[in-house]
């Protein structure tokens, strides 16, 4: 398997540990993610064209946190979590030269998460567009994601919880 596949798998295992509240499993999976960071950084160190290390990664994240949180590290004020998020996205857009609220959203996200992220970003930027443009399944799913957001829910999390309940019912019926 490609190394990116392992990284993605470990990320999902970490998500599962968080959602199930299994702190021992979470500790184990965070260790596996940390191993992935170290592994990919080690590969990067051997790149003769553009080498960098795990120390460079750590330094970059510290610099990013300082730049994007002037309410903590500078003199700006953010009164709410929404203010913090808006400031973060505005600074990130400037740094990356993004012109749209939806620029930079990875289209490889799981589809329900992708839909939720796109709609959240658009709404946060004051852009209100109907989630679906026809009566096809994709548009209906977009509307369901929008409804979940309006209800304060995350569609991806809700569907995973429903899948866990389904698995339990299947196991029960198998006797």
PLM segments and residue spans:
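Flexible "arm" and connector segments at domain edges
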Residues: 1-29, 35-175
